[in-house]
């Protein structure tokens, strides 16, 4: 079953960008890992979409399982592992942790070790509050949602469709120090792609989704050429969140959903828009 889970994860992942054939990583590559998502791995959706598993392989785990193919700079890995563990101990849930500020000394050490960086971006996925626009401040809150919505608003200044300020700062830091920058997106839905689409400083982007207990290993195998990222996008990724017709009326009520876009839901809207 674990092999089936890993294979399904690999087949669903999508290679969104690969300039100059940076991926797959050559045999014997050295990489430096950045981003709390390296350890703050989200295996799947919350609420009714959640399942209990005996273990979870994050991206670091996956790469370490392939250490005959790739070597990891342990200093940055230790930094993010310790930070995420502290946040979990304080009650944070996967995908809802803060991106820590990267010390310049760690960045310099990593850059001396290799010219290849891997940034992991992760997002929690749950019903009712995971797709929030920045101007949507009127949603009613109740029970556990109250705390989660408050945390979401604090973490994601413009909504979780976009990078946070801390994530933007991290990306800028890493781009300034590395010739090859690979991004792994551990997300459950559509996100902003404008920040990497035309940026020559971002070499490759793997949409790894929330790929279950073996998701980290699946992503690592694709990064190192042990498989082909042949998945295709099943959704339309808009330039900005407001381009989706449902954004304007989303979260107006907890009791009902008002389809203000009429029948033009999803692909119907994008296929008929003038």
Where are these regions (language model features)?
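C-terminal non-catalytic regions of proteins with extracellular/luminal or membrane-system context
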Residues: 2-274
């Amino acid at each position: 079953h674990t092999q089936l889970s890993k294979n399904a994860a690999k087949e669903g992942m999508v290679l969104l960008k690969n300039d100059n054939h940076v991926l797959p990583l050559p045999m014997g590559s050295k990489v430096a890992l950045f981003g709390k998502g390296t350890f703050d791995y989200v295996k799947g959706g919350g609420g009714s979409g959640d399942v209990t598993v005996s273990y979870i392989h994050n991206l670091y785990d996956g790469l370490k399982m392939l250490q005959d193919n790739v070597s990891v700079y342990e200093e940055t890995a230790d930094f993010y592992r310790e930070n995420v563990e502290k946040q979990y101990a304080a009650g944070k849930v996967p995908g809802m942790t803060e991106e820590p500020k990267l010390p310049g000394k760690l960045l310099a050490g990593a850059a001396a070790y290799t010219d290849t960086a891997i940034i992991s971006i992760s997002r929690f996925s749950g019903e009712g509050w995971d797709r929030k626009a920045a101007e949507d401040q009127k949603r009613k809150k109740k029970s556990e949602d109250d705390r989660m919505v408050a945390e979401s608003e604090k973490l994601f200044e413009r909504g979780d469709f976009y990078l946070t300020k801390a994530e933007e700062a991290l990306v800028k830091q890493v781009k300034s120090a590395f010739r090859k920058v690979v991004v792994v997106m551990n997300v459950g839905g559509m996100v902003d792609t404008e920040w990497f689409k035309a940026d020559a400083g971002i070499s490759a982007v793997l949409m790894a989704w929330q790929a279950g207990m073996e998701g980290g290993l699946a992503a690592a195998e694709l990064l190192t050429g042990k498989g082909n990222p042949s998945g295709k996008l099943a959704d339309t990724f808009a330039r900005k969140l407001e381009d989706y017709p449902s954004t304007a009326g989303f979260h107006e009520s907890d009791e009902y959903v008002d389809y203000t876009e009429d029948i033009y839901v999803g692909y119907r809207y994008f296929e008929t828009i003038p």
